[in-house]
Amino acid sequence: MAKSVEGRNQKPDTGSQKLEVRSKMFSDLRRVSIVICWLAMLVFTFHACTHMVAAGDTWVAMACGRHFVNHGVDTVEPFSANSHKAGPTEEEIKTWPSWARWITDKVGLKTVKKWHPTGWINQNWLTHVIFYSLIPKSSYAYGVSFPSNALVYWKFAIYIVTVVCVYYTGRLLGVHPWLCAVFCCFAMFTGRSFLDIRPAGFSNMLVAVFLLILALTTYRNVLYIWLIVPVTVFWCNVHGGYIYAFIMLVPFIGLHLFTNCNKKWTAILYNITAWPFLFFVLSRAGLTFPTFLFSILVIVLDILLVFYKKNLVSIGWKGVYHTIAAAAAAFVATVLFNPFHLTNLTHTFVISVSEHAARWRKIHEWLPAFDWTNPVGTAKPFLVMFILGSAAFAVWAIVLLKTSTSIGRQTKRKKNISEGYQWPKIDIPIILIGALTIYMAVRSRRFIPIAAIAACPVIAMFIDQLVRSISAFINFRKNKRLAVGVMEYNLQLFIVLAGAMAVMYFGVWWGLKFKRIYLDSWPRDPKLTSMFMRMTDSGQKPFYASRFIKDNELEGKMFNSWTEGGFIAFGQEPDPNTGKTPLQLFMDGRAQAAYDRMAFELWQDIMGGGAGTAEILRRAGYRGENLTNDDYVKIGQWMDEQLRKYNVWVVLMPQLKCSVPRRSEYYDKRSYHVVQGLERNLDWRLVFFNNKQRLYVDIKTPEGKALFDGIFNGETLYPDDFHSNLIRAHGWLYYRMGIAEKKKGFDFAVKAFELNESPAPMLEIILVASKFAKLRADVQKFCEDYIKRFTENESKWAKEDGFRNRVEAGRIASYYLENVARIENNTKLVNDYLAQQNKYVSELIRLARIKRW
């Protein structure tokens, strides 16, 4: 009897134990799944940070950072002869509106200069200081190397912070951890092609931080809103994108204000603000795809605010008051705690909505997202996100409203229905902020990263609420119980295992690819091989040209490519007292921050050869002919006149501008023809070149003549023996008379090639030396020997840095030998060298494919 009682008493214990075991299994699986989620987000963040983006702005940043560290933050621009001058001056004030002149009279010019300075307004000054401070001086002291990867680590760090903020924003919106992690990964993937090492990276991160603060304010405690004060103070000093916070605070405050009013006042206030604003937008921009989307958004918000007001999330009147106060405090703080004070604010509007703002935005990154011919970044993931978000919103709205209405009617009729699930409230402010950020990205693709950051948590919220509501509805129809069904353990286990396998697959794949691209041998350069060099394509920058400028103490004014300006400034030795660089730029990538529109258009006009070059190209294009030598002489004469007009005596151009364009681009690449014209002008001589840059000087100036003569008398200094032999080869082959001198030039070219087996010395040999009959046998033997040596050492060289240069040199040599064989009517050799060329071209294509990311 005792045994039977004991046995009966043990049965409930067994059931309880099973329940505990089952509960523990679910709990353990959840913990494992969270770890996998974090690993997935880190893997996708790592992948997002590996994209290669050219870094023109990065070098500008380091030049500016050095200036600010050494001389403080001011509006005196030190790098260019054509930049804004510090002010305002009394002459400038005379051109101001009457109300501005009245204020100046009342407070005094000194006060105006302090609180609204003009000149060089560097909104990114703190980022520039951070960039410069992160780099050890040993990395750039000599000027022809840059081994530091500190800025690469900075990039990884800010985007890890970003993905953490995006994840917790989604969690605060009620999204399941798995779904939240998936959309965090998608956010990083969407913005990947736009994530580079530049000040905008801070804005991308701070958008995520800002949205997390809004979510904390809404779902945790309204006092979190005060965090925007320190965030915006930091933000306004690292990047001009801080204005995003104030723009998005307007709908955040406005919509929460509407939700706290009664239905009547909500309808009145919304309609008297939203519709006039929509009319203003349409009158300015017209009916375009982005404005059409904005119109739809205004209508949807009107419906939600009027008919579904009780279902809206609200922070209450206390939250509204705190948000208004925090926004006001943040605004005042950004003016007080910024070295440019009010100008930091007004400058943002000048470059965004002023008369000439559109002119500055005619660059690739400012163009619309869905301009598929745009070479900057890719908008395909953004298009997927856009379609997914639109579909999710539409289905979410339909299903949520339909199921809630249907269940609402039945629960009123049947009071005994068990309710365990509450229909979610609608967070209009967060939804609107996500939608507006998408609108920004549709208009300008540079905003795609922040659109992904703002929208992905919202899209995840739509899907999460959609799935939960459908599950609750099905459960209600079947069991008359309003509750979300629990996913079976085996299904959860399958999803976790599938997720783990996916994370492992992508982690291993991208890890191996990272090793191959960033850690293994680098074919594009034999020396500039750090991760930073590869990721930013900075190996193309004028390292050795800048060293040449520094060693020969060049001063005055120069003409340069837009994208090279920042590096040239950083590569010089500034005046220790003023920070002014000796050789002043014509233009650089700081654009409207440092230059007037007229200066930019002047640079464009000269870079394009003016109206004369355009007319010459138009006529040649009409005839389908190449430009003649006479055409180039005319272009060169015009260039000479323009450069002298602005006291320019140095011109530095990337080799890309000197390379013959494809036939389809021949009549459009005006910069190529401009450089060709300059080369044919006898007053402008080449004094420095390599595989990446060419530097010309005006020999009618004493400085230019001294540099040119120094090639022959040894007084002009060069960074290394390769460059000195290369320029001597050019000088002797072009300008010295007699075959003995030409032979000497050929020998210089051979020495240069032995020091750096690359295209530049090879081209000097086959394009110039081969023109002289007595050198052709030497040239032919040299090319044959190199082809043989390349074949013997190819497998070894393929594992070394700079392999691409050797392949390209081999292609050029085989091309020359093919032409020699044609002249000799040696069909076998012609076919052999054609096969060699095809092999080299295939290898170049392969290297370009496997060493890009």
Where do the PLM segments sit?
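Membrane-interface alpha helices of multi-pass inner-membrane proteins
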Residues: A187-G191, L212, I225-G240, A274-R284, ...
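Specific aromatic-rich, kink-prone transmembrane helix
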Residues: A61, C165, T190, F202-R220, ...
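Short hydrophobic alpha-helices at membrane interfaces in multi-pass membrane enzymes
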Residues: L216-V233, K263-P276, H322-A326, I428-A435
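Transmembrane-helix motifs of polytopic, lipid-linked glycan transferases
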Residues: Y153-L173
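C-terminal luminal/periplasmic domains and tails of membrane-associated envelope-modifying transferases
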Residues: K3-E6, R516-T563, E573-Q584, R590-W853
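Membrane-interface transmembrane helices that cradle and orient dolichyl/undecaprenyl
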Residues: F210-I225, L255-W265, L301-L304, S390-W396, ...
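Transmembrane-helix signature of polytopic, membrane-embedded enzymes
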Residues: V166-F189
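Juxtamembrane membrane-water interface segments that cap and precede transmembrane helices
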Residues: T104-V107, I121-Y132, S139-G143, T346-V384
